[in-house]
């Protein structure tokens, strides 16, 4: 039953974010903000597919242990694409609120992203085994969490300052995604049931993507 539910949920998620992302790109009408948002959604869905597709196959066939290599490789790829996702989201923020300068913030985004990717590439992560050490899960997620926190603060402040109702909950979607993700990193191997938190985490990312799509539709409708 769990295998069927997870598989159907993952299919729904991937189809949703990829289709919405493609629509954003195709219907952006040259808007850099919405083009970035579209590519952000495509990167999210494409990256997650490397992990979710093998997971669905594993759950519906011989089990997760039999797909250790594929699942580990998928997590490895996803860890990098999620970093790219937040870099793109940072540039959505710059485009939407017409941000000029602020080189220190940009350098912070690049530094945290680079640190995250470098840590993800370390062999100590043991991605391709069933025994990825918790310590390295924490190390590689520290710069990722700081990157997420930075983006949360940027969107919270800017949406409030500009009275941006379309993006007023963007910061919350990121808070929720990390709030559901961190317990899985810390206790997923010890308390397997915490893995279920990845479902609401995924829903938070769908909300993120839909915020961008709804904003595009509303702005173009208003222009017409």
Q: Model segments located where?
A:
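Hydrophobic alpha-helical transmembrane segments of multi-pass membrane proteins
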Residues: 39-57, 114-116, 172-185
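Hydrophobic transmembrane alpha-helical segments in integral membrane proteins
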Residues: 1-19
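Non-cytosolic membrane-interface motifs at loop->transmembrane helix junctions
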Residues: 3-5, 63-75, 129-142, 191-201
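Membrane-helix boundary elements
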Residues: 111-138, 155-159
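Internal transmembrane alpha-helix with an interfacial aromatic "cap," most often the third helix
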Residues: 21-27, 50-67, 72-106, 120-122, ...
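Membrane-interface helix-boundary motifs at transmembrane edges
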Residues: 26-37, 93-105, 130-133, 156-168, ...
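Alpha-helical transmembrane segments in multipass membrane proteins, preferentially the mid-helix core
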Residues: 16-26, 87-93, 118-123, 142-168, ...
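Terminal transmembrane helical module of multi-pass membrane proteins
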Residues: 171-217
